[in-house]
Amino acid sequence: RFWKSGPWRGPPMSISPADGGISRYCPGGASRAVYAYPAAHYPFWQTVRAQARVAAWNEPLPWGSLGENLTLEGLDERHLWIGDRLVLPDCVLAVSEPRLPCAKFGAALGFAQAVGLMAQSGFCGAFFAVVEPGSVSAGQTGRIEPGPREVGIRELFRARLGR
């Protein structure tokens, strides 16, 4: 399965194992070096922000607003398993865990109910460890190398929430 990195304005993002916790909203160790979020979920968050009256109906949600430092096109939680590798032209990342809802997420979106909506929707994104350091640029196409496929991101997300 192939996927594409999402919109990014600026130079290529450098990724290395020493970057543990480069996510702006969810710091962590080496297993959380990169937080990736599916672009497909952005319309949902734009709609619920408008419903919560923290944004206008036509107000776009800027890329990176969900705390991610990598936006994925054509790939979401249903297709990510712990240990899968995302192979890009210049680096390799390994799926490590789902993001759990936290107050920082609600603050980033401008309304506290966002935390519950993440839990309910399962639109959590995923953290990645760096296997081979390198850089990522907008529009790069990558592929998934399947891992053991024992635990999916959505299933682990639900289990950690006790659902």
Where on the chain are the PLM-derived regions?
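Electropositive, beta-rich accessory/interaction domains or terminal extensions
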Residues: R1-G106, Q113, P146-R163
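Solvent-exposed, well-ordered amphipathic alpha-helical segments
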Residues: M118-A119, R143-E145
